Amino acid sequence: TDMLGKKITVDTKTGGNNNIIVGTKASLNSEIQKAVSSDLDQINEEGYIIKSININNKKHIIISGKKEIGVLYGVYSFIRLIQTNKSIEKLNITDSPKTNIRILNHWDNLDGTVERGYAGSSLWNWQKLPDFIDQRYIDYARANASIGINGTVLTNVNANALILTPQYLEKVEALANVFRPYGIKVYLTARFSAPIEIGGLKTADPKDADVANWWKSKAKEIYARIPDFGGFLVKANSEGQPGPQNYGRDHVDGANMLADAVAPFGGVIMWRAFVYSEHDANDRAKQAYAEFQPYDGKFRENVIVQVKNGAIDFQPREPFHPLFGAMPKTPLMMEFQITQEYLGFSTHLVFLPKLYQEVLESDTYQKGKGATVAKVIDGSLHKNKITGIAGVANIGSDLNWTGHPFAQANWYGFGRLAWNPYS
């Protein structure tokens, strides 16, 4: 009503002319199903169609998908057409996301502070959860769904094990319940030393049977509360964070142990490749390559290695990370930074999607010319089952969400490129 200046009539029955008919494939009547069947065959489980049809001399616009989430994405796409003054005559749109995991990484701490955050404090008011559900949680979910984001990591990669305790999992469950209708899965960061800090064990060695069993038990506990829990994001053996190397193990040992814990429930481990130490003799730019490339193909099927766009640390003009052209047997996901750590915080006006686009269009030459970074992360180059793209969020408690009002465009642009890295 606000957008068009007139009230729209909503009905559960199809009749009359010039209808917008919205629903899953299964909910459409047989006549309409037949008219859009070939279009629906072209989309995946999250995809949608927007199609103008004429049945019995009556015009309709059909917005449909195989699943409810696809229908929701289709509705947002249709609204975007209207908002941008595009024609809605003779529509014939079929669209599906190119990546499986399109996710925001919140570097939010449990005390309400946000590492590299320039838009106020954390959105998550842990003190009031699970009983008080802030309207902003719902608005956050709607905004993300409108640009195709389907996952959120609630906590900082410099992790706090307390998030895995029952007291906090109850709060996480409340957020998951809010986000679920909008197709957004909740993920958490896993502190590698959690078995010691909250589990009473004397070690966090990934080869220790008690440690592996502790993580399996913890995963079972989480999935009992949140059946669609996405999995864990892990920062290990970097900038002082604990990890498998503390016990003479490697990244594969750590990632695979956690992967085995969440695998029975369909969970994913996103293991970060951002590793460096001031005590390591290696050139920092080479360290991730040195620690990960030799293990190409050794990770479990439900592990995806999350690689920053550059080898140093989100530097404004650094080349794309060499790992994108060096691990053909391992799913890799992109990690972009939406928050402006190196680009003026929330003081400067910067449009980041052009930077993202440049990285995605860069050629790895992994299989000859045209083997772009986008083709690596969307799985089309190496036929990966798990694909993804992450963005370190620039969102906080500020009334305009992002501190600088223009920074909303970076959140928006990330979501659109996560859906389609070629757009």
Show where each model-derived region lies:
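Residues that flank catalytic or metal-binding motifs in active/ligand-binding sites
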Residues: G16, E46, N100, E301, ...
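Hydrophobic faces of well-ordered beta-strands that scaffold small-molecule active sites
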Residues: R102-H106, T152-L154, V186-A190, F232-V234, ...
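Feature activates predominantly on carbohydrate-active enzymes
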Residues: S37-L233, A263, F351-P353
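Active-site-proximal beta-alpha loop/turn segments in soluble metabolic enzymes
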Residues: I196-D205, K235-N246, F274-R284
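Substrate-binding groove of N-acetylhexosamine-processing glycoside hydrolases
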Residues: K90, A224, P242, R249-S423
